[in-house]
Amino acid sequence: MRVNNGLTPQELEAYGISDVHDIVYNPSYDLLYQEELDPSLTGYERGVLTNLGAVAVDTGIFTGRSPKDKYIVRDDTTRDTFWWADKGKGKNDNKPLSPETWQHLKGLVTRQLSGKRLFVVDAFCGANPDTRLSVRFITEVAWQAHFVKNMFIRPSDEELAGFKPDFIVMNGAKCTNPQWKEQGLNSENFVAFNLTERMQLIGGTWYGGEMKKGMFSMMNYLLPLKGIASMHCSANVGEKGDVAVFFGLSGTGKTTLSTDPKRRLIGDDEHGWDDDGVFNFEGGCYAKTIKLSKEAEPEIYNAIRRDALLENVTVREDGTIDFDDGSKTENTRVSYPIYHIDNIVKPVSKAGHATKVIFLTADAFGVLPPVSRLTADQTQYHFLSGFTAKLAGTERGITEPTPTFSACFGAAFLSLHPTQYAEVLVKRMQAAGAQAYLVNTGWNGTGKRISIKDTRAIIDAILNGSLDNAETFTLPMFNLAIPTELPGVDTKILDPRNTYASPEQWQEKAETLAKLFIDNFDKYTDTPAGAALVAAGPKL
């Protein structure tokens, strides 16, 4: 165990933390394991050992991110660059915070951390040394230190010796803000960022993902301004060095489809694309575990072992896990270091330029085809739309689809206007000669979800080039190019109209969905570039 390793209380005092007695610096996994299972711990600090060897923790009432409690200091650094919640047509979570309120929140967190035994983890965000962030995480909770050790890139001893942080994350999960009403904030909880001080503050929420996605939001600010694409996607590479990226919102299949025994994983959630190629921001994976089974997702199941950290799962008395129990939350998760997956890119999670760009959508309306090949304008249109839909059950068992449009398949994490991400992505794609595809992993007219077997065969056809050589026909209204046949895929499902009792049924649902697309895209028409893309979308 390295305690301090040259990190002094004085360095923490520079951030406003005083009276530091004990710094546990970059703790080993073995030490974290002992700390988390310390029988004297109470409440959400306490970990429970499971039969798989991984420790499980509870994150309290926050079992997901708290977007309504996210704030960014509006000052000279950010005023003219950030995509603000109170400007323009697009709705987002980037609520402005005054420098005065920031100082108040910072005082709350530093007082919470002062006089405590602190865990400090220094790690990298970004696998490219030229553009990575050196991040210092400070917390009083052992498992939160474990979470960031899993999720970020672990520096070597040599890198730690010369580590100079670019960004500080102070996690004061145990403190809240009693003055939130007078300050015009959403609640007593807060996740706040200051780009001038290069710091994130967390108060009131124990959810580990706030640290992960907080740094993603920062990369989403810094990289596109340098012409580097910053993407909410998974990525993998084939035997010939061919790289594919998979964009998609939560639950559309990013982690599942990119974890492919035939290809090496670059990463499952956050990537950049620069002059050298595609690189992971992270050093770990954060997989959903609801209804996880060894049969359906063996790689993820086998990654849950010692050093993995489970969140909000139900652990039985005997230490076994009920993965089917979503009573705490449907968003049960596990974080693990990326090397828990066997088939990964080593030693650094990066590869060459992507030639296949896949947009995953789970269309609960049953309108979109399982796969279509996009033109350059359609690529931008569907990237900015970021569509998926969930099935929400109602009391009588009728299931109505709920549409979600999330710009760039990750609106919650965007720091700049969505068109800036689209422009950078398109430039990178054009330079690499990349082709985009829209893949529907959702439902069709039968009311059943498209099988994972068919979806995997579709992904194979995209990656091995057979889809590009297939004959296509055009789906009306959406003007999408669909292959007439693909190896290993039931031909009947390729045209979504065939899965309905009559084409009129599809037509009716298609009109509903097309209108939703058109209404959503209106917010991008306030720029000439956005207005020009309307023609690439559906037409009624």
Curated annotation (Swiss-Prot):
One matching Pfam family, short form? PEPCK_ATP
Highest rank taxon of the organism: Bacteria
Q: Name one GO biological process term.
A: gluconeogenesis
Where are the membrane-spanning stretches?
none
Report the principal subcellular site.
cytoplasm
Induction summary: Induced upon entry into stationary phase and by cyclic AMP (cAMP). Repressed by glucose (catabolite repression) and by CsrA.
Output the Gene Ontology terms for molecular function: ATP binding; calcium ion binding; magnesium ion binding; phosphoenolpyruvate carboxykinase (ATP) activity
Localization:
Cytoplasm
**How is the activity of this chain controlled?**
Allosterically activated by calcium. It may represent the only case of a monomeric, allosteric enzyme.
Q: EC top class, in one word? A: lyase
Q: How is the cofactor bound?
A: Binds 1 Mn(2+) ion per subunit.
Write out the entry's keywords from A to Z: Acetylation, Allosteric enzyme, ATP-binding, Calcium, Cytoplasm, Decarboxylase, Gluconeogenesis, Lyase, Magnesium, Manganese, Metal-binding, Nucleotide-binding
Please tell me where Mn(2+) binds in this chain. K213, H232, D269
Question: Where N6-acetyllysine occurs along the chain?
Answer: K87, K523
Report the catalytic activity. Answer: oxaloacetate + ATP = phosphoenolpyruvate + ADP + CO2
The residues the record assigns to binding Ca(2+) are K149, N150, F152, G283
Q: What is its EC number?
A: 4.1.1.49
Family membership, please give it: Belongs to the phosphoenolpyruvate carboxykinase (ATP) family.
**Quaternary structure, from the entry:** Monomer.
Outline what the protein does.
Involved in the gluconeogenesis. Catalyzes the conversion of oxaloacetate (OAA) to phosphoenolpyruvate (PEP) through direct phosphoryl transfer between the nucleoside triphosphate and OAA.
Q: Any idea what this protein is called? A: Phosphoenolpyruvate carboxykinase (ATP)
